[in-house]
Structure formats: C-alpha cells, structure tokens
Amino acid sequence: MLFNDGTPSLNQPEGAPAGQALGASVVSAYQIDPVARTAREVWRFDHQPELSSEFCSSVYQAGSSYLVNDAMADNAATARIVGLDANRQQVFELSYANPGGGCATSWNAVPVPFEQLQFD
C-alpha cells in the first residue's frame, strides 16, 4: 500500500525515469508476486473531489481501517486527514490550515485511540 502523491521523482539516479506526473493524489494497494517480480493494483482510493498533495503525505493502516494524510492539499494551504473504514469508504475528513505551505504542519498521520478519553 502506498500514497502516490502524483509528483515525479526529483532525485533519481542518472538515466532512471522520474515517473509519471498525475493530476491528483491516490492511495493504492498492490498484490506483489516476488517470483515474477510484478505488482498488480488491487484497490485504490481517489478522494472526491480530487486532491493533489505533492509531497509529505502518507497512508496508515490500523486493523481494517485506513488513515490518509494529504499533508499539502489545496495548493499546500491545508492539510487533510481522511478516515476510511474496512470497506474503504470515507467516514470522516478533518481539514486544517497549513501556514507556510510546507511539510511542517503534517507529515505522517498516526491513529490516536480516543476510547479512554475523558473531558472534565
């Protein structure tokens, strides 16, 4: 599973392809055949409407749920955290300002357990 930010590589060995530029970022999971040395995409999550987050983003699996971090969404003006359930359906989205527009506001999202959280 990976977060494909859609940005071609900026630092690859000389002569190596930089990769394809995509119009939007996607999360994809692959089935890998180590003998044939091939990979086949088995599912993907495309945020609707489409988002582009060119750097710093990630996806995290916790059990059968997923946490998607679009760290530089909306032309790097916001960070968006999206929760997906076991059916990979969006169950929540949190959007917050990304002052400065870089990777300092958000990087790798990690689930925080709120089961024992109490407010006084």
What does each model-found stretch correspond to?
Residues 1-120:
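Histidine-/acidic-rich catalytic cores in large beta-rich domains
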